Amino acid sequence: MQVYPKFMRSAMATEHFPPVTAPEFAFLGRSNVGKSSLINALLGSKQAKVSSTPGRTRAINFFSLTTSPERQQPNFLFADLPGYGYAKISKSISAEWPKFIEPYLAERPSLALCLCLVDSNIPPQPSDAQLTEFLRSIGRPYLVVATKADRLSGNGRTKAKQTLSRALEAENLLLCSAKTGLGMKELWGEIHRVAAEATEAMKQNQRPPSA
C-alpha cells in the first residue's frame, strides 16, 4: 500500500506532542541500531535524518502518514524516539526520559505499538532488555525488530532470532534489513494490521453511549 509521509514536529516536552488523531507507532532502539534508516526504508523517502554520530536525535520526531495524497487527517503516525545506550549521551537521555519520553510511552492514549529495534549482529544488550521489561510493566504492546539482518547467513538469522526472542521475551520478532528490504513487507503488514484495529477502537471510544 502506498503511503504519503510528512514530517509533523519535534517534541521535547509533553505539551509539544501533536493532538491525538490517529494510531501511533513508536520506534525505539539503541543509538546506531539503524532506526532512522529503517524508518526511511518504510517511508520510501529520507524523512528521518541519518547520522553517523550516535544519539543525534534528542527529541521525539513525529511523522504523519496518509494512504491518499488528498487526505488531510493522517491514517497513522510514526514517532521516532531518541536513541539510548551510547556512553557519551547516556546521561542526557537519562535526564530527558522522565520529562517527556516516559510520559509518552506510559500515558499516550493513541500509542498503538512500540517497535523495539535491536541489532541482529550482536548479543542481546541489557538496555534492550530493560526497555522491553519496562514496556511489559506498563502494559504496552511491542514488537521486536532485529535490524541489519542482511549481514547474517541463513543459520545466523535463525540463531539470532532464537537468542533475541528468548532474551527479550518477544513472542513476535521480525528480522529486517533497510538495505535489502528483507522483512519490510512483513513489518508493513503488522503495522497496517495494528493500525486498523487501533483505528476501530478509537472510533468506538469516540461514539456517544447509546440510550
UniProtKB/Swiss-Prot annotation:
Residues binding GTP, per UniProt: 29-36, 55-59, 80-83, 147-150, 176-178
Coiled coil: none
UniProt keyword Cell cycle, yes or no: yes
MF terms (GO), sorted A to Z: GTP binding; metal ion binding
Family matches, as Gene3D superfamilies: P-loop containing nucleotide triphosphate hydrolases (3.40.50.300)
One GO CC term, this protein: cytosol
Domain called EngB-type G: residue spans: 21-197
Keywords carried by this UniProt record: Cell cycle, Cell division, GTP-binding, Magnesium, Metal-binding, Nucleotide-binding, Septation
Binding site for Mg(2+): S36, T57
Reported cofactor(s): Mg(2+)
Any Pfam family matching the protein: MMR_HSR1
One GO term of the biological process aspect: division septum assembly
Function, as annotated: Necessary for normal cell division and for the maintenance of normal septation.
Family of this protein: Belongs to the TRAFAC class TrmE-Era-EngA-EngB-Septin-like GTPase superfamily. EngB GTPase family.
Name of the featured protein: Probable GTP-binding protein EngB
Organism for this UniProt entry: Acidobacterium capsulatum (strain ATCC 51196 / DSM 11244 / BCRC 80197 / JCM 7670 / NBRC 15755 / NCIMB 13165 / 161)
